Amino acid sequence: MKMIIAIIRDADSDLVTQALTAGNFRVTRIASTGGFLRRGVTTLLLGVEEGQVDAVIQILKDKCPAGPDGGKRATVFVVPVSNFLQV
């Protein structure tokens, strides 16, 4: 299992969340602030099976357009999960 942490622009968050949900991915959405100018961003948390990582990254690529200066679309971390519990 993998934990995907994706930091995206607020402007992209609704479209990305809808696309991930349509792909049957469960998403936790957190409002956050970051970057040099301290602009609002959204942090998405997804727990997925290893075989689903590429599908999530493709959705992020499709739904997060490059910035006006050709800048990054999103910052994505893929972290191994050794244990998962629901209590």
Q: What are the language-model segments listed below?
A:
Residues 1-87:
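Positively charged, small/polar-rich N-terminal and surface patches that mediate targeting and assembly
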